[in-house]
A protein has these predicted regions:
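Alpha-helical packing segments of well-folded alpha/beta enzyme cores
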Residues: 59-70, 96, 130-134
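N-terminal DNA-binding recognition helix of tyrosine site-specific recombinases/integrases
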Residues: 133-141
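GST superfamily/GST-like fold recognition
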Residues: 25, 81-116, 123, 137
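C-terminal/domain-terminus segments
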Residues: 144-160
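Preference for well-ordered, secondary-structure-rich cores of eukaryotic proteins
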Residues: 10, 15, 38, 48, ...
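Short alpha-helix boundary/capping elements
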Residues: 33-36, 96-101, 159
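Surface-exposed helix-capping loop/turn segments at secondary-structure junctions
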Residues: 72-84, 140-148
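GST-like domain detector, emphasizing the conserved glutathione-binding G-site
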Residues: 1-64, 76, 81
């Protein structure tokens, strides 16, 4: 992902406009990778019916750390994570949160095992800037055709 963004930087500056922005983007990609590790373990365990208290707790903590950091980065009311335009950090964030929303499809399984959903109904109140940014990205013209139907499908499972 990083290499592709660097190759096209003259046309699409997804890796920032200077070394400072590139460094910030790298930081977001690194924390996204840490979150992705625990979220993938969690989502795979959910799909296999093997989620346990340890896996659930690690994913819950990973999400809280990730979302808290993003919430702080988006303060005060930034429209993007780095710089003044969409960057690789925003793309990665949108992809990670959309993938994590697959938890919605396993709400019944979580309930049967006595676990609450990590992306519970009030999570948007806990991280308002994160979810406002995600909503902006879903409606971004280059994301909308693919991301919006995917997220809507997952949200419909949460409502069910």
């Amino acid at each position: 992902m990083r290499a592709v963004a660097r190759l096209g930087e003259a046309t699409f500056p997804l890796y920032g406009r200077d070394v400072y922005e590139a460094s910030r983007i790298d930081s977001f990609l690194d924390v996204s990778l840490v979150f992705a590790r625990d979220s993938q373990i969690y989502l795979l365990a959910l799909s296999d019916g093997a989620v346990d208290a340890t896996i659930h707790a690690r994913a819950k903590q990973a999400f809280a750390i990730y979302a808290s950091g993003l919430e702080q980065a988006l303060s005060p009311r930034r429209d993007t994570l780095v710089g003044n335009g969409i960057s690789l950090a925003d793309i990665c964030f949108a992809a990670e949160l959309a993938l994590f929303m697959n938890e919605h499809a396993r709400a019944e399984q979580l309930s049967e095992r006595g676990f609450d959903r990590i992306l519970h109904a009030g999570v948007q109140d806990d991280y308002p800037l994160v979810f406002a940014h995600f909503a902006r990205l879903i409606d971004y013209e280059h994301f909308r055709p693919d991301l919006k139907p995917y997220v809507e499908k997952l949200l419909s499972k949460a409502a069910a």
